[in-house]
Amino acid sequence: MKPEIIDNFFDHREFDYVKNAFSNLEYSPIPGASGEETEILHWNYYSVKTIYLNDEPVDESWGVIRDIFLPKFHLACQYKTMLRVKVNFYPYCETFHKHPYHTDQDFSHQGAIFALNTCNGFTEFEDGTKIDSVENRLFLFDPSVKHRSTNTTDAMGRFNINFNFF
C-alpha cells in the first residue's frame, strides 16, 4: 500500500477542537528512541500517550477519537476495528535526527498518522518516500512496512497521533 495523503482532514473548527484536546496531555517519556544506543543521548527520546490498546480505551481522550476521528475514518478508509492509538511527541533539538527504521507490527494492517502541528519533521519509508509533518494532514499506510520518525529543529516539538487498525 503506497501512502495516501489527505490534507485538511478536518475543517478549521474541528481541527482546533482536536488540537486543543490533545495539547495538554501528560506524556510518558520513552528513552532510547533510536533503539540502538546503550547510553541515553539528550536528543534520543520521545514521549507517548497511549489512548487505546488491546481492544479498550486506556485514556479519557478516547472520546475525541471515537466521536471526531472515527466517523471521518469510515469515509477515508475501510476501518473496521482499532488496534492501537497513541499520541507521539518528538522534542525540539538543535540538530536534526532520524530514528532507525521500524515496523509497528509484524503483520500487514492499516495505519494512519495525523499531524497536530507543522514542523520540519517527517516520516520516511525505506524506499525514500517522505511524508512531511503538516498540521491537519492524515496519511494512510501499511505500518508493517519499515518507516522511521524524526525530531524537529524548527518547532517546540513534533506532535502526531498514530493509529493502527484493520
Feature annotation, model-predicted:
Residues P100-H102, K146-D154:
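Short beta-strand His + acidic residue motifs that chelate non-heme Fe in jelly-roll/DSBH
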Residues M1-K80:
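Non-heme Fe(II)/2-oxoglutarate
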Residues Y92, I131-R148:
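Conserved metal-binding segment of the jelly-roll/cupin
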Residues A112-F114, A155-F166:
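A short hydrophobic beta-strand segment most commonly corresponding to one strand
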Residues M1, E124, F163-F166:
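Double-stranded beta-helix
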Residues F89-P91, L116, F165:
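Short beta-strand segments enriched in hydrophobic/aromatic residues
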Residues T95-P100, F107-H109, A115-V134:
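A short beta-strand-loop-beta hairpin characteristic of the jelly-roll/cupin
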